[in-house]
Structure formats: C-alpha cells, structure tokens
Amino acid sequence: MSDKLQYVMVDGIKCYSPEVASAYTDYPDSGFDLTDKNAKSSFWVSSRNRLFKSIVQSHLKPTGKTKFLEIGCGTGDFIQQIDQIKNLEITGSEIYIKGLVYAKKNLPSVNFVQFDVTKGTVGAQFDIITAFDVVEHIENDNAALSNISQMLNKDGVLIISVPQHMFLWSKLDEIVKHKRRYSRRELVDKLKANDFDIDYATSFLFILFPLMLISRLFDRGRDQPLSDEQGLEKRVKFSGVLNTIFDSLMRIDEGLIRLGASLPFGGTLVVVARKR
C-alpha cells in the first residue's frame, strides 16, 4: 500500500512532491509554453480532446457527483473541455509546477495539485482517472499504475493513452523524453498486473497512420541541427490548411471509436480499464 502524501503550498498550489516540481527530468519545460500557445490550433490536441471528452461523458455516474482526476494535466487544455460538465468534480494534477501555473491561469476555479504519481497517492478516492500521454515519460510505469489503481474507487475507470509501436520511435520521442512506446500487449499486461480489467482498447491516429509512418522514417534520415525547443516546435506545428485537413480526417477515427470499433493500428493506443 503506497503512502498518502502530505503537501506544502507553493504559489497557491498544493505540492505533494515539491522536490521534483521544477526538475523537468521527464518532460521539457518548453513543452508547456508550446502547448499553452498552440493547443487551440492543433488538430491533434483538438481531436484527442473531443474523443476523450466523449469517453469521460460515457462513464459519468448516473446520479450524484463523479469525482475526476487527471494525471499529467499539463496546462489544463483537456480540463478546459470538460469544465462545464454537470456534476463532474474535477482535480487536475501535474508533476511540474510550470504546467500548473498555466493551468491555474486558464482555469482559476479548478482544484490543481502537484505530485509525483510514482511516490504515493493524494486526496480522496476517484470515480474516473485519466492519464493521457503520461506514463511513457515515467521510468517506473508500474509504480504509477499501482498508485492510480489505489486512488480509484472499486469499479472506478482509468482512461489512458500512450504512444504506440516502437518502430515509430523518432527524434520527437527523444525531445519530449519518452522512455518507451507501447505495444497493446505490454500496456494491457501492465494494467492487469495492477488490478485492472480491460473494458476496451483501440488504436488512434489510424487514418493518418501512413503519413505518420512516412514522416517518422523521413525524420530518422534528417540532420538534427536544431535545438530541442526548435525541433519540438517544428515537429508539432502545421499550417492552417494542413491542420484543417488533418482535423477532418481525425474525425473519421473519432467516429469509428464512438461506434465501438477497435482500430488495429495507429500512432496512439487508448485503453479504458476498470479497477477490480
């Protein structure tokens, strides 16, 4: 059983792991600046948030409040999409304080906390926990999944996404400090080992997968003279026209998943798991 962490207040935010709040060892601090600046114009962020909002809505409790925790909320872009959902009691968490400063600025009424999910648990038990593109940054992902399980009520739901397929590994994974990309079997096995049953699993970024594969192969052969910050921005920013086209194509993925399809391959893996 993991320890329940104690907090100190830093910049008006409860910090349960203040010793790592400004370390940025598992994610570049410039990533928060880029996300806050570009999230609303990114086809990937928009599509991901639409899909995950629909999944969260489908798992709300039929009566009373649903207690919700986002692990790795970053600048709060997803919470901005769900903030107005009735009877959803939201907590956002992030290991690095810079993301939370942006999140608190964008959503001053939301409860945000800083903590390292590998070190223990915080707060009350939750009905829904999300971790979108988080555990691939964590060396000890089993510790993170174990603590997430302990923070869920019985039959509580974890909605998790991770980058998929190690053959897609590229400079971008290195810049954002990924430890791994997952296979479906690897993530499912780790979830089952930490007291989860699998409700649903699907790939995402399915329609755009051929373009993603080509871009990753091209990236491997490219000289890398740019700084990590410049390299990150170059790889995640697209023209307005391309963003519009890609956003339209991503809606095909979203529609298929909402219909219950389990897409066989894609750049991202999405799993809905239930605590035993």
Where are these regions (language model features)?
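A structural helix-start
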Residues: 138-142, 162
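Conserved S-adenosyl-L-methionine
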Residues: 196-206
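A short glycine-rich, Lys/Arg-flanked "PGG" loop and its adjoining helix->strand segment in the class I
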Residues: 142-157
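Short, glycine-/aromatic-enriched active-site segment of Class I SAM-dependent methyltransferases
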Residues: 36, 158-180, 184-192
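Conserved N-terminal segment of class I S-adenosyl-L-methionine
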Residues: 1-132, 142-145, 239-240, 252, ...
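A C-terminal cap/extension of S-adenosyl-L-methionine-dependent methyltransferases
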Residues: 2-4, 41-42, 122, 208-276
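Residues lining the SAM
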Residues: 132-135, 161
